[in-house]
């Protein structure tokens, strides 16, 4: 449960990044803010399915999220917003694959369905970025 809950925290980091891009590229703010909302939605769903609220789980996630965020922002710091969004589109597809990989480990059809929905939501943001980027470059 801790890994999906940790992924939920990373989704929130991505949501924050989308909000920054909305400020940087205001003519596309509406679509980018929809992507941010999708990231928050995925995080909410993951936290509902995999709450990971045990103190040791929370402590481990708190210890790991800082370095993970630092790495995420460090990778992006040398890239233009357009390059960052191209990387993010790929990350969204990797996220979709991660949620789908968890389906095999679940026996509850409701959780399997929720994970598939989360993957589809990830792909919606990737599709948005893939459509947006050619017009920005």
Model regions: which residues?
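Non-heme di-metal
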Residues: 1-137
């Amino acid at each position: 449960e801790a890994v999906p809950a940790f992924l939920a925290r990373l989704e929130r980091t991505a949501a924050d990044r989308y909000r920054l891009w909305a400020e940087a590229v205001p003519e596309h703010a509406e679509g980018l803010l929809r992507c941010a909302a999708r990231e928050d939605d995925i995080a909410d769903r993951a936290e509902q399915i995999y709450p990971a609220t045990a103190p040791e789980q929370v402590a481990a996630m708190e210890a790991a999220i800082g370095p993970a965020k630092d790495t995420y922002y460090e990778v992006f710091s040398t890239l233009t917003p357009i390059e960052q969004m191209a990387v993010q589109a790929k990350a969204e597809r990797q996220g979709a694959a991660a949620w789908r990989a968890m389906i095999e480990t679940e026996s509850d059809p409701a959780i399997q369905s929720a994970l598939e929905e989360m993957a589809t939501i990830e792909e919606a943001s990737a599709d948005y970025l893939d459509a947006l980027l050619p017009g920005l470059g």
